[in-house]
Amino acid sequence: MKNPQKLAITFLPLYVIPTYTLCIKALYKNTHAGLLFSFLGFVLNTPAMSISGPPTTFILYRLHGVRRVLHWTLPDHEQTLYAFTGGSRSMAVKTDARCDTMSGGMIVLQHTHTVTLLTIDCSTDFSSYAFTHRDFHLQDKPHATFAMPFMSWVGSDPTSQLYSNVGGVLSVITEDDLSMCISIVIYGLRVNRPDDQTTPTPTPHQYTSQRRQPETNCPSSPQPAFFTSDDDVLSLILRDAANA
């Protein structure tokens, strides 16, 4: 009789991979912030995520009424312009979570062999990201899914800028119902504040931040006390990372 331990190890992926795929699809298809936050809370409280050190940050854009306006390619460059009618943006740092509604706007996705640029522009939110990665070929087709590991990133919104050489994963999912999910997972942050009087140990992060009026919170999301109402997304990430 064959070794049962070897058999278990051999057939384990047949159970784990489909289960993981179903969980991801269920997460992206569900529009209720409560389920999203419950899932993130479960992940963030697992032993693997509870170790000491910088927090893992999740940013999720759930957009609907998406249509592709423009798409063109060059030998070493690809750009796609999308329009959307509305959506939401959710984020979680450690065990803290927040959800904001978004009005209609535009998305620009630019991709080269080493850098991917993502810009989301609407009346209630403007965010721009640049992700540095190794050679990666994006196949931007309708109803396509891709996940791209990155080595460093730059983010900016109307009040904040952040540079970080901490890596993570960017994923984009387009679905049959004219919806799109964009998720950014960042594996930790270490922050230098420019107003520190002491000379800090050199770290690869710099930012500036101011305050502005908040967006409207999603109706189905709680009103948590750990996020002040006049913080921007990057400001929240930076503050929680600094306090980690």
From Swiss-Prot:
Lineage, top ranks: Viruses, Duplodnaviria, Heunggongvirae, Peploviricota, Herviviricetes
Domain of life where this protein originates: Viruses
Protein's recorded name: Nuclear protein UL4 homolog
InterPro entries associated with the record: Herpes_UL4 (IPR004958)
Compositional bias ranges of the Polar residues kind: 205-220
Family: Belongs to the alphaherpesvirinae HHV-1 UL4 family.
Localisation: Host nucleus
Pfam families for the chain: Herpes_UL4
Keywords on record: Host nucleus
